[in-house]
Amino acid sequence: EKATVKGKQTDLSFELKRHEGKWMLPLRPILLGGDDLTFVCDGRIALDLAETALAVFEGSDVPHLGKITACAGVAITRVHAPFTRAYELAGKLCDNAKALVKQKDISSCALDWHIGLSRPGEAVTSIRERQYQVNPYTLTCRPYRLSSENDDELSWRWLSKTLLDDPEVGLRGKKWSTRRNKVKAFAELVREGPGGVKAALEAWNVTAKEWNVAKELCLPEPIAENGFHEKHTPLLDALELLDLHLVLESDGQGQGGNEKP
């Protein structure tokens, strides 16, 4: 079956196949031992495959242990980037996700990612301070917990399914996808803080009313008002993944129906 993105065909240069009823995932395992799993894959599906792997742990019920959790670090680099540095970065990102779970004292899987290589020896916290800190605001919400049964807001699944792909409020949804220049504008607006984002949203919608455009531009809760939750914003995280994060789904034409691998 073809790889699809939310029902649309996309050229990933490979097809998803099934063997004896099981999906053959397009990845190459590098390390399978102990409690660690490392694999290499097309960067555009890396986060989706990481979520799929974490979901297995999320749904686990081990005798005498109960529910177990796991964390993932995803380093998205160029094809010819030094593997050792990418591997080390992925490990640091995984540790950062683990720190979130420990700090928040939550029973949830979590993941973190970075696009490109870091400086040699640079900690993830230093990367975030250098690239995403505009005092008093933090322009990222990474790492993300996968989600929880009672609270999906500001989780990875919220970012992927709502902030990116919700038809009404998602940045890749029906309303925002035809206003790509405005979506890209968030990259600079967030540096002005909540006030800058709020003012832009209001101005865009006033203009839309003047042109008799019925579709009001809005963001999902809990960032609907100004793009921020407290002093953090997930908008830059979403913008970085706008053209890079693909969700694999069945096209429904072959064996497996609408199953997701």
Residues covered by each model-derived region:
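Charged, helix-rich terminal subdomains or tails
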Residues: 1-261
